[in-house]
Amino acid sequence: NYYYFFNQRGNVYAPLRFSPSKELDFFIKSNPKILFLRDPRDVAVSAFHSFGKTHPLPKSSKSRKVFLERRKRMNHLGINKFSLEFLREIVMPVYKEYAQFKKENHNLIYIKYEDFALDVKGTIDSIISFLKLRVNNYDLENLVNKASPITEKINTNSHKRSGKPNQYFESLDKELIDFISNEYSDVLSELNFDLINWKL
């Protein structure tokens, strides 16, 4: 049934897993867009467990050596110091661009991972409506059943640990959560992520 989902030419059906770029301006402005983001604090927690614990090792010896050195440093830092460094240097500069991208683009549906995880069917229905797709109930139910990102139990040895939203509550120190919420309040607010302040 792919014929009613996809055009054979003229469109790109793929995630853009990097910051918006000027080279893509024309494409971005002239086509409908799905902006799908996870809470950056959970991104940091997930990165720590993935790259620090469970991510498969690269096959080449040179890449494996670099990877293991990075993994050793991450575990030495611990989850709090790593998360702050990772957010400052990698995640939040990109999310700042995405926040601006969201403000400037109208032909766009913005979806938070957290909303998707808690309401898979409702989120998929919204995407179908936004893209004006025709999807029969059988295909829709199949997609919903396969798409849920949440696992029943947290498996610390699995690359996919749990998929549950707001894991940073349990993983990061309260003081760090407050600091991140204050330092990046503009970006978090624009992207509709909660501003947590434990002192209130």
Predicted regions and their residues:
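Short, solvent-exposed loop/helix junctions and linker helices
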Residues: 37, 117-118, 170-174
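PAPS-dependent sulfotransferase catalytic domain
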Residues: 1-70, 82-109, 175, 179-183, ...
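Short acidic alpha-helix initiation/capping motifs at coil-to-helix transition points
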Residues: 21-22, 116-123, 157-160
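PAPS-dependent sulfotransferases, especially Golgi type II membrane carbohydrate sulfotransferases
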Residues: 81-84, 99-102, 129-200
